Amino acid sequence: MSAVIDTPDHHAGDHHHGPAKGLMRWVLTTNHKDIGTLYLWFSFMMFLLGGSMAMVIRAELFQPGLQIVEPAFFNQMTTMHGLIMVFGAVMPAFVGLANWMIPLMIGAPDMALPRMNNFSFWLLPAAFGLLVSTLFMPGGGPNFGWTFYAPLSTTFAPHSVTFFIFAIHLAGISSIMGAISVIATILNLRAPGMTLMKMPLFVWTWLITAFLLIAVMPVLAGVVTMMLMDIHFGTSFFSAAGGGDPVLFQHVFWFFGHPEVYIMILPAFGAVSAIIPTFARKPLFGYTSMVYATASIAFLSFVVWAHHMFVVGIPVTGELFFMYATMLIAVPTGVKVFNWVTTMWEGSLTFETPMLFAVAFVILFTIGGFSGLMLAIAPADFQYHDTYFVVAHFHYVLVPGAIFGIFASAYYWLPKWTGHMYDETLGKLHFWMSFIGMNLAFFPMHFVGLAGMPRRIPDYNLQFADFNMVSSIGAFMFGTTQLLFLFIVIKCIRGGKPAPAKPWDGAEGLEWSIPSPAPYHTFSTPPEVK
């Protein structure tokens, strides 16, 4: 432990050395900023890959009739798009933000367990190399949807399913190690005076998210291992012929899957809770209630999983319980939304790019929440289930929710990361193009879904043609706009107006007390928090 509690003068010369030179700096790095950067670049590459798969889906659905891909390949695209976006884009992006920002926010010299931190990143290229390689195997890649329901993913799966299972194992191990690292850091490395109730909300949401990850990732590992056993080792967990039950798969999967969707949104809640007070130039309204609301959401996320299964045939008592439990999540979520709105109320608002994304987050995430309340109503869900209405719902919480939260965070902290201000005009252009493209892409899906257009089908009835064309145009617009974001980031790294230590007027917190760009080693001597 001596390295953690060293006196500041010990190895005085070592405290200001920069990174090693060359490629091995990145392979072997234990520096939280390097690892955060690796996560962020990796997640953006996966975002572009998963996004290009979505472009294939939308190109096929531009017109009715089978146009450009075979139905079998279409199913591989929907499956891989979901898996890559969830496990490859959204989650690693938030882990990257956690690695970069949590030590700076709590005054820690680095993350706890830095070598495990490095390993948890390097598992990801292996996992996704394995996953993407399945597309080139005989019989093709996973074609059973990102939820990989048995028996489609077991009895009737392509041969490549085994590689998919190992990819999920690797991604899960990575997530667990990242979460352990976050918890160890937050609980052990806070600066003197930084009590739990003084932590920035981003740190709080990540602490709770990390506990969620540790709780549910083993469940995911368990369910894919049961699949592996059914496929190769003669068990019958999910096969009725051998005394098993395909519905068991759904229960185990969604017991992981529902907390998982909260894992993807809670860090965004934390980031937005840092950004809105900054640009409203007043403290966050209801800090304590925000902490308790986050914890309530996390707790409730474990008791709602069967709302994904209303049409499977579960006892009506069960449907009632899961319906009411699901609706209950709207309460702490509503607390959060009203706190954000109240924070903006009578503030001295300015709308720089991070604030634009944060305000869009609040508005559009709320729309996604309302359609979620509709889906929670068990009798109504018989109409909505497996239609594009569900696709509209979860893309309204994932795109303006998770993705806009990531964009807002990136613009907010880019000056701290690079030492330069990004191009504000281009940032605003990126926002408006993303905002318009996203709404064009996903709003019409509510209509075609309510009219009965089923999900995951490469062809559709003529009556849905117009809205699908609008959706596809919006999707292409949203997709191409992300190349502009890449340009903005590279331009910001290469140069631009030098960023001060605190580039935003209303910003609070330890991360703004260090120079921009953040030095390679920070808080070697812990700061005092009053």
Pin down the residues of each PLM region.
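Membrane-embedded and interfacial regions of multi-pass energy-transducing membrane proteins
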Residues: 2-530
